[in-house]
């Protein structure tokens, strides 16, 4: 990526450059620092959700190993972008054949999204790893460890990356916003975390996009994401719980048509509101509704009609709202 683009993208501009710069995943960072100290390492397997620091940790590791000229010793490949295992194998062969003098007798290949490779491609990758193990170390990054074949897992040191804590993500967003002199609401930053579920890269991208509205507010965040405002989703839910099914369904159609939202988007927002403190209902009712929300999301993902499934969910809310809340509270 060019310097000009890096200056534009906050996610790259504020990416930690060294292991000491990384403030989370402390246990992993401490283990990686030992490799730097020993100037040796095995093949590594980084597993965890998107945006938890897998690529950042790999880049910081090779930077600390080789210094500012680490790019001469480092090859980054993406399993999704490459045209097949033959392309990857040829690139690795070309990369590994040249020897650069120095204290460290090996180069490093980072293969991102390795879990997108077929089992056959992974078997071929395993053979490639064995062929060049004398002067090349592989770092494989994946979102789903279960999709990596056992022969590769057994030949690598596993590092599990866990979702980042809310405090860590929000504090990082505050630091970036202040550094960029961007005005922000604390609630907006917390909302970004809730939406991204701790994906730091996605959180920073949303922060930057929302800053274009002048002030980083909750409204700006939802505009950037193309989602309905939370108050509109809450209004729909409350109408249903009050037994006003027709009005709730009309609100649903507005969200689907006017905002152009997908059923999956809406059901996720409903889930977010039901689990928040904004919707005042009993825990028993909350548990029941969450069960139906899960069923609705599953059916939508499986291909069922968005409006029919969401209308059925609103009908369930109306039925159980009447049962658990009662007409005296309306």
Swiss-Prot record:
CC per GO annotation: DNA replication factor C complex
Annotated S-S bridges: none
Residues given in the record as ATP binding sites: 48-55
Keyword rRNA-binding annotated: no
A molecular function (GO) term: ATP binding
UniProt cross-references to Pfam families, sorted A to Z: AAA, Rep_fac_C
Record-stated family: Belongs to the activator 1 small subunits family. RfcS subfamily.
Entry protein name: Replication factor C small subunit
Organism of derivation: Saccharolobus solfataricus (strain ATCC 35092 / DSM 1617 / JCM 11322 / P2)
């Amino acid at each position: 990526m060019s310097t000009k683009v890096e200056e534009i993208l906050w996610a790259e501009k504020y990416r930690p450059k060294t292991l000491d710069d990384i403030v989370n995943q402390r246990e992993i960072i401490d283990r990686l620092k030992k490799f730097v100290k020993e100037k040796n390492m095995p093949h590594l397997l980084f597993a965890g959700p998107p945006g938890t620091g897998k690529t950042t940790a790999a880049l910081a590791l090779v930077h600390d190993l080789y210094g500012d000229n680490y790019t001469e010793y480092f090859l980054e490949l993406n399993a999704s972008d490459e045209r097949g295992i033959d392309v990857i194998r040829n690139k690795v062969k070309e990369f590994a054949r040249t020897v650069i003098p120095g204290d460290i007798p090996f180069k490093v290949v980072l293969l991102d999204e390795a879990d997108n490779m077929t089992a056959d491609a992974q078997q071929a990758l395993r053979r490639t790893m064995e062929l060049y193990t004398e002067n090349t170390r592989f770092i494989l990054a994946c979102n789903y460890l279960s999709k990596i074949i056992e022969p590769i897992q057994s030949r690598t040191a596993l590092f599990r990356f866990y979702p980042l804590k809310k405090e860590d993500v929000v504090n990082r967003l505050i630091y970036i916003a202040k550094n960029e002199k961007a005005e922000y609401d604390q609630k907006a930053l917390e909302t970004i975390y809730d939406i991204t579920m701790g994906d730091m890269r996605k959180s920073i991208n949303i922060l930057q996009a929302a800053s274009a509205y002048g002030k980083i507010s909750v409204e700006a965040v939802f505009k950037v994401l193309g989602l309905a405002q939370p108050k509109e989703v809450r209004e729909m839910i409350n109408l249903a719980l009050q037994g006003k099914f027709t009005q709730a369904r009309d609100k649903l159609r507005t969200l689907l048509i006017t905002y152009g939202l997908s059923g999956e988007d809406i059901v996720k927002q409903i889930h977010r509101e039901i689990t928040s403190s904004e919707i005042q209902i009993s825990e028993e009712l909350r548990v029941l509704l969450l069960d139906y929300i899960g069923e609705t999301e599953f059916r939508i993902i499986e291909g069922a009609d968005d409006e029919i499934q969401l209308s059925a969910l609103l009908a369930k809310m109306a039925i159980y709202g009447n049962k658990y809340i009662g007409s005296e509270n309306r």
